[in-house]
């Protein structure tokens, strides 16, 4: 059975935790493990932070859009901005790459997303924005503790 939710909010860093908790609450209906839920929350944090810091250059007038679709035990997560876009997606996905070294960011956002999700697709157009599509299968059977 399909279920979906859509969320949009101002590109303010204090909204990152709101997005993370909201997505986690929605995904909880699948009864994910703590690890699965932590991975999803981390990925939401990374994608939203990228949109705020890189997409909108910390301009709080920007809007971050999140969509989550749950279908057949699969979480389809989309995080989109209408910011500056990414000129070279392949370069941006390299570990430790950052366009803002002065902020002492690690440049590991996309690497973390790729490690925690089953699929990551990034589409971007300069001066139009970036969309990150993420997919994760949630295990159906959970190990029982004795």
UniProtKB/Swiss-Prot annotation:
The record's keywords, sorted A to Z, are: ATP-binding, Kinase, Nucleotide-binding, Serine/threonine-protein kinase, Sporulation, Transferase
Family matches, as Pfam families: HATPase_c_2
Describe the reaction catalysed, as an equation: L-seryl-[protein] + ATP = O-phospho-L-seryl-[protein] + ADP + H(+); L-threonyl-[protein] + ATP = O-phospho-L-threonyl-[protein] + ADP + H(+)
Source taxon at top rank: Bacteria
Q: Which GO terms describe its molecular function?
A: ATP binding; protein serine kinase activity; protein serine/threonine kinase activity; sigma factor antagonist activity
Q: Name one GO biological process term.
A: sporulation resulting in formation of a cellular spore
Q: Does the keyword Ribosomal protein apply?
A: no
Q: What class of enzyme is it?
A: transferase
Show the CDD domains listed in the entry: HATPase_SpoIIAB-like
Under the heading SMART domains, the entry gives: HATPase_c
Residues forming coiled coils: none
Q: What is its EC number?
A: 2.7.11.1
- Any idea what job this protein has? Binds to sigma F and blocks its ability to form an RNA polymerase holoenzyme (E-sigma F). Phosphorylates SpoIIAA on a serine residue. This phosphorylation may enable SpoIIAA to act as an anti-anti-sigma factor that counteracts SpoIIAB and thus releases sigma F from inhibition.
UniProt similarity note: Belongs to the anti-sigma-factor family.
Q: What is this protein called?
A: Anti-sigma F factor
UniProt organism field: Geobacillus thermodenitrificans (strain NG80-2)
**Corresponding gene?**
spoIIAB
């Amino acid at each position: 059975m399909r279920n979906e939710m859509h969320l949009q909010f101002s590109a303010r860093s204090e909204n990152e935790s709101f997005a993370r908790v909201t997505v986690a609450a929605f995904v909880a209906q699948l009864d994910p493990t703590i690890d699965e839920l932590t991975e999803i929350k981390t990925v939401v944090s990374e994608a939203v932070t990228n949109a705020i810091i890189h997409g909108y250059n910390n301009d709080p007038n920007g809007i971050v859009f999140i969509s989550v679709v749950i279908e057949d035990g699969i979480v389809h997560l989309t995080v989109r901005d209408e910011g500056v876009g990414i000129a070279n997606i392949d370069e941006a996905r390299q570990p430790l790459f950052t366009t803002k070294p002065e902020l002492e960011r690690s440049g590991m956002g996309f690497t973390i997303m790729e490690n925690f999700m089953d699929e990551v697709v990034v589409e971007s157009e300069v001066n139009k924005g970036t969309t990150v599509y993420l997919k994760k299968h949630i295990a159906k059977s959970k190990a029982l503790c004795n």
